[in-house]
Amino acid sequence: AVLIPVQTEYFALEGLALLASTIREIRRRLNPRLGVDAVVLTMHAPTLLNAQVASQIRETFPDLVVDPPVRRNIRIAEAPSHGVPIHVHAPDSAGGRDYLELAISLAKRWGLAHEVDE
């Protein structure tokens, strides 16, 4: 299964279409069971363009988009420079909370909810 992170930006939308095409080709030629399991919206900002792109992604992949979208947040960008993940660097930041909620959503989606302590 494939999990696709995608920025809510126009060029990322084009890249998502190319990736979907590549996955279809791999399925046809090599692995008929390969499929997209989830699409995660990342680097999301409260702009009209981001909202429009997110809406288009949701329309194209209605059962695959997992909430919440991960908001654009400086703490996420800082974490790798400190050599730690966001949940260590700034767990209470918007990005830290978004990734925690996303992990819980994915665990529920994959039937691992009994292993998640909310």
Segment roles from a protein language model:
Residues 111-118:
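C-terminal helical "lid" subdomain and adjoining coupling/linker elements of P-loop NTPases
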Residues 57, 99-106:
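Hydrophobic "lid"/C-terminal helical patch
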Residues 1-74:
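Conserved catalytic-core segment of NTP-binding enzymes
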Residues 24-27, 103, 107:
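Generic structural signal for well-ordered alpha-helical scaffold segments
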Residues 80-101:
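C-terminal boundary of histidine-terminating zinc-finger modules
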Residues 71, 77, 87:
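Nucleotide phosphate-binding site architecture
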